[in-house]
């Protein structure tokens, strides 16, 4: 059993002139500490009560959205640089709010994780992605993100096995993406779950590589089949020699470990040319396609990709 401690602090008289007010503000600070991941203390700041109310509103609307099926899955294509052909897509969830329109995951995923809603939401995304991918060409994979909270709660291997069985998608065509944050705590338990997933035949990818801690030790210990280079390195490598050297080294490391490398956030022809020169196997980014509905016709043709020459930066 893992026991964690979070502390919320409010001071009198600055944070309230009555005991009831100070206690209420301390409770708000405690909720903020837990919402930021726990195992920390947080001092009350004016405005937190409004932020907490907004968060509770999002939580309430999230619960309604799950029942109303207001979510949709969009796909961003991934390409093989050597053949210049699409090899798969990453599944990304969007919330189609009846009032506010399309909402990106950055505005609701953290709330889903803190409230336990990430479990049913994540399973819904996994099932939808596998259902869609079963209709794609047999050579195409689908990548699905797993949050740390989703991974820790319950038996993720059993859930994945059940979804694969229901949808008929071969396990080798499913790739599960996790971030380094998942590997920091409970490493033995995480390793066991990852090994069970690999035994199913599912591929495991480390997402946002280079943004966390002890990345190299993770590569030696955990059963990864792919590394995704974080977009910050790709964005800066054409003008920063240090970033360029890091990208080149990661690609070489992948070859040595027999691990596929995918460069995220490719937006310019210059970046693509440099990655091709370095021998990067796969790319993903706005240069090659924005997240959207899966192009079944384009997949069936599996022709060479024509990069979007006027790709613009926007939130994926």
Where on the chain are the PLM-derived regions?
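PAS-family sensory domains
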Residues: 1-3, 87, 172
């Amino acid at each position: 059993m893992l026991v964690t401690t979070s502390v919320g602090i409010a001071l009198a008289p600055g944070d309230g002139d009555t005991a009831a007010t100070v206690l209420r503000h301390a409770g708000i600070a405690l909720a903020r500490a837990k919402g930021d991941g726990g195992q920390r203390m947080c001092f009350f700041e004016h405005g937190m009560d409004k932020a907490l109310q907004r968060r509770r509103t999002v939580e309430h609307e999230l619960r309604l959205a799950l029942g109303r099926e207001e979510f949709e899955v969009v796909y961003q294509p991934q390409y093989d640089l050597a053949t210049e052909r699409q090899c798969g897509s990453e599944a990304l969830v969007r919330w189609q709010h009846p009032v506010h329109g399309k909402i990106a995951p950055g505005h609701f995923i953290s709330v889903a994780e803190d409230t336990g809603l990430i479990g049913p939401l994540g399973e819904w995304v996994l099932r939808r992605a596998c259902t869609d991918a079963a209709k794609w060409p047999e050579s195409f994979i689908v990548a699905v993100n797993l949050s740390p909270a989703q991974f820790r709660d319950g038996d993720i291997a059993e859930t994945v096995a059940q979804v694969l069985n229901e949808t008929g998608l071969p396990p080798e065509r499913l790739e599960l993406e996790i971030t380094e944050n998942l590997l920091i705590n409970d490493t033995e338990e995480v390793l066991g779950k990852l090994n069970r997933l690999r035994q199913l035949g599912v591929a495991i990818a480390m997402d946002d590589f280079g943004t966390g801690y002890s990345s190299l030790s993770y590569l030696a210990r955990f059963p990864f089949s792919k590394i995704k280079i974080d977009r910050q390195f790709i964005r800066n490598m054409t003008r920063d020699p240090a970033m360029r050297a890091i990208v080149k080294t990661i690609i070489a490391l992948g070859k040595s470990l027999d691990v596929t490398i995918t460069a995220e956030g490719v937006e310019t022809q210059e970046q693509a040319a440099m990655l091709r020169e370095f021998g990067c196997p796969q790319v993903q980014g706005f240069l090659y396609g924005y997240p959207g509905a899966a192009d079944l016709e384009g997949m069936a043709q599996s022709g060479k990709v024509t990069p979007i020459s006027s790709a613009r930066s926007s939130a994926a």
